[in-house]
């Protein structure tokens, strides 16, 4: 016999190489997959290495209309002089694509690949908070609180390894439940 599989909410993850899972080298240990085992979403992971807040990439999907969107990126803009322009443009366009869809925005994780890296993460986080504030359908959580600031949890002081991905996913689930997203 064939049984129909029940599917949870449709959730679109938009992000960079961390969302894609680079650094874990174990598909099951990416934070997206760890979280999904507990949340049981029907998900589409659009994590792309090198991705940043590019408004031109925002467009409605025809074959996957999400019930929720989770955006997790920003670290690739840390050292860009014009990062504000990109972050502002992305969040200005976002309502035209996902204006009524609940959105969770995860700011960049802690990183230690350069001496001033975390200061740069905090700059990006402040810009994300500033430009997402007008969005009534969005909630922001600090990514640097989801993975401990411990180099042993990172493959290269930037991308979480399998242990870091597991912790990230578990902490994300707890946060999603806490804020009722």
Predicted ranges, named:
Residues 1-65:
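Serine-esterase "nucleophile elbow" of acetyl-processing enzymes
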């Amino acid at each position: 016999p064939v049984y129909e599989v029940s599917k949870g909410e449709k959730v679109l993850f938009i992000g960079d190489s961390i969302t894609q899972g680079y650094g874990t080298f174990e598909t099951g240990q990416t934070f997206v997959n760890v979280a999904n085992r507990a949340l049981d979403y029907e998900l589409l992971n659009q994590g792309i290495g090198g991705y940043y807040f590019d408004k031109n990439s925002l467009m409605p999907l025809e074959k996957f209309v999400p019930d929720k969107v989770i955006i997790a990126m920003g670290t690739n803009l840390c050292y860009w002089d014009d990062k504000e322009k990109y972050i502002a443009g992305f969040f200005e366009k976002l309502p035209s694509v996902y204006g009524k869809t609940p959105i969770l925005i995860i700011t960049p994780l802690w990183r230690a690949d350069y001496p001033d890296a975390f200061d740069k993460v905090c700059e990006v986080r402040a810009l994300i908070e500033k430009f997402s504030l007008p969005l009534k359908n969005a909630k922001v959580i600090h990514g640097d609180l989801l993975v401990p600031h411990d180099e042993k949890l990172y493959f290269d002081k930037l991308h979480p390894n399998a242990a870091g991905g597991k912790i990230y996913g578990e902490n994300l689930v707890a946060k999603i439940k806490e804020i009722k997203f």
